[in-house]
Regions:
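Active-site helix of classical SDR
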Residues: 126, 162
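Conserved NAD(P)H cofactor-binding loop of Rossmann-fold oxidoreductase domains
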Residues: 94-99
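Substrate-binding pocket helix/loop in short-chain dehydrogenase/reductase
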Residues: 102-115
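Conserved glycine-rich Rossmann-like NAD(P)H-binding loop of the short-chain dehydrogenase/reductase
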Residues: 34-50
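Residue(s) in the substrate-gating loop at a strand-loop-helix junction
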Residues: 146
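C-terminal helical subdomain
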Residues: 186, 207-243
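Conserved glycine-rich cofactor-binding loop
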Residues: 13, 18-22
Length: 269
């Protein structure tokens, strides 16, 4: 299946969360070029306005914008209400928050807000859109998890655990909804050049790790070539190998190695 078939399969509208920057923004641009009308959502009003102008310059598609903080119930309701005015057939849920560092040093309120965004919004949106798609007899859901969600990730404990939820939910819904015409897959990117990467780089020296970052465009290109054929989509050969070893073959050893690796890579402040 090529990207062009996705509009015919699900179309005409796609809702993309986290479209202000990074992977979400790259999804919005790519899917618009493939012919989808795009419903872009995010917290940064100026970034979404800039994206809307770029989409207008490069495509002839329709664009709908929702400014919403998906870590709040009000933000989720605003997105859902706007999406209900459109014939959305595909959801790409790329919004997410990241945290890192020693578990006991984390700010509790920030960590709980992370869980609201990464877990609560994922549940709410997956529930709403899957119900809508089952009713219309077709639809697609692509949830964005993380490579860290596939294995033990010391110093990323809360973030990785939240992404494990996304991974498990997506895989479970894949099997549950397939017979009802709804495709569900999970994208688990490794290290990617996004604002999230820049935030982590303030505290972690990536040169002391074997991890190599990919561009958001590479991640999105691979994802759309794989969706919906693959349930678990992991861009990058090295990342796929890491997921297999960390999740299935040597999980405890992998976790121990990650603890040593990131403890040494953490910058002193």
């Amino acid at each position: 299946m090529t990207n062009l078939n996705l509009v015919q399969k699900y179309g005409p509208w796609v809702t993309v969360t986290g479209a202000s920057s990074g992977i979400g923004r790259a999804f919005a641009l790519k899917l618009a070029r493939q012919g989808f009308n795009v419903h872009i959502t995010g917290r940064n009003q100026q970034s979404l306005a800039d994206l809307k102008e770029q989409l207008k310059e490069q495509t002839q598609i329709l664009i709908h914008t929702t400014i919403a903080d998906l870590s709040t119930d009000d933000g989720i309701e605003r997105l859902i209400n706007d999406a209900n005015t459109l014939d959305v057939g595909l959801l790409v849920h790329a919004a997410g928050a990241e945290s890192h560092g020693a578990f006991n040093d984390g700010d509790i309120n920030q960590e709980l807000s992370l869980l609201d965004l990464n877990i609560r919004s994922t549940y709410r949106l997956a529930h709403h859109f899957s119900e809508k798609f089952v009713s219309r007899g077709k639809g697609g859901i692509l949830l964005v998890s993380s490579l860290t969600g596939h294995f033990h990730s010391p110093y990323f404990a809360n973030y990785a655990s939240s992404k494990s939820y996304v991974l498990t939910l997506g895989n479970s819904l894949h099997h549950e909804l397939k017979s009802k015409g709804v495709d569900v897959s999970v994208l688990s990117p490794g290290l990617t050049y996004t604002p999230m990467y820049e935030n982590i780089a303030k505290d972690i020296d990536w040169s002391k790790t074997p991890m190599k970052a990919s561009s958001p465009e590479f991640v999105v290109e691979y994802a759309l070539k794989s969706f919906p054929r693959k349930v678990n989509i992991i861009p990058g050969t090295g990342n796929r190998i890491s997921a297999v070893f960390g999740q299935r073959i040597l999980p405890r050893f992998f976790g121990k190695q990650n603890e040593s690796l990131f403890r040494k890579a953490m910058k002193a402040h």
